[in-house]
């Protein structure tokens, strides 16, 4: 079911709950704690938030939601609040008909695809604080504030029990989890592993911008991460050196950052779980990727 504004969304969600009241919910039988936390004992509702141009990565999020919830809501909205000056807001791919086909294939109950969310733009916004000032935030000031404002609004409108986000956008996931914890949102945030092409390239809606040659060059990102992960037993300096060697040898890759960070707060790591994150431009397209790894506990982080 496609809905285009807040009133239609409210009506669709009410209709879902009414329909469920006369039929035993299927997924709730094994939903565990999520079912117990479900509002007013209604069926478990999940949301997957997207900007459209859906690909297999989004489909994996929808499948994960479908497996855990009785009701699945997908949102499709290109959020202007998270685009800065000179970024690709105007040319970001918009493929609603194809997106609806993906949602139908994956069993989505409601697709919320509004033309606008905030009109006029909100005076009061969520802020990512220090989490939004590093890594992506250093290159894209205000990006995470705009993202959190939209995510917070969607959580309020959809009222989900579960919210699914991809681990490829690691900093986004960290910020969302912190917002949910700090502001007491009644929702469980679930990260889903990065979907990759057979050759290792992380799936992204922006991959459509790449020429055939640039797509080959972009493989340096995932190869660098793999090299870094393979060196993790030797400590943080070895991880960064191995990954940097791959990037330095690559043609057509302009690296923005390559860093190790803590998976909970993006701070320096001294050992244990860590994220190795990379951002680079290939041609005019900015790509990000990351990998989780474990550092020796006696090794000082970078």
Swiss-Prot record:
InterPro entries attached to this UniProt entry: Pantoate_ligase (IPR003721), Pantoate_ligase_C (IPR042176), Rossmann-like_a/b/a_fold (IPR014729)
Pathway: Cofactor biosynthesis; (R)-pantothenate biosynthesis; (R)-pantothenate from (R)-pantoate and beta-alanine: step 1/1
A GO CC term assigned to this protein in UniProt: cytosol
Active-site positions on this chain: 58 (proton donor)
Binding site for beta-alanine: 82
Alphabetical keyword list: ATP-binding, Cytoplasm, Ligase, Nucleotide-binding, Pantothenate biosynthesis
Catalytic activity: (R)-pantoate + beta-alanine + ATP = (R)-pantothenate + AMP + diphosphate + H(+)
Keyword match Iron: no
Biological process, per Gene Ontology: pantothenate biosynthetic process
Record carries keyword Transmembrane helix: no
Segments passing through the bilayer: none
Note: The reaction proceeds by a bi uni uni bi ping pong mechanism.
Protein name: Pantothenate synthetase 4
